[in-house]
Amino acid sequence: MRERVVITGMGVVSALGIGAEANLSALLRGESGVRTVRYLPTEHREFPVGEVPMSGEELRERLALPSGVYSRTHLLGVLALREALEQSKVLQQSGLALISGTTVGGMDVTEHYFPEPQPTGRDIHDCGASTNEIADYFDCFDYTMTSSTACSSAMNALIMGKLLIESGERDIVVAGGSEALSLFHLNGFKSLMILDTQRCRPFDQTRAGLNLGEGAA
């Protein structure tokens, strides 16, 4: 018999704001988080994007992390996960499972150092590193897994979390995804010529492409 699966906590960070309640309120007001690029160091500012309205330094300070090198994917993920754990009231427990979806992980850090590589290596660049860093912040996970299947990464993480609970392998699973905008994203989709210079209009006769965004949930 399959175990029953219920959701006990949610955390959301997006271009609409920080927190599930803030995001819901913004959606109900009909707001859009798509606007001119502010934080991504790109020359292609003609393409509007959905950026989380905080710089990397502001995110670090909000999480009370010491000075250091942190990928934006890591920071967004921690912020969303903290809200979910606080809602579910399992923050003081141990032995939890974390399954996080991401496409490029800490690519923003890779791009920062690419012009002048550093002699000392950092385990921050592969997509699974951000999952481990998110887990390390809370020190309550003994099982981590990364799903990296492009746009379906976080959805596959949710599916895997559900299966782990239904099978009885895990009692509590935290599942979702985190992704930060990078030059890799913007340049890649620009090369495909599918980015819109205005807010996208997917069901309109004048549709001209998509807008990229970032966030965690």
PLM features: residue spans?
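Short conserved active-site loop signatures built around small residues
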Residues: 154
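Glycine-rich, Trp-frequent "lid" loop and neighboring beta-strands that shape
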Residues: 151
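Internal active-site segments that recognize and position negatively charged phosphoryl groups
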Residues: 160
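Conserved "HGTGT" condensation-loop signature of ketosynthase/thiolase-family condensing enzymes
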Residues: 1-143, 163, 182, 191-211, ...
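Short, high-confidence coil segments that cap the C-terminus of an alpha-helix
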Residues: 170-171
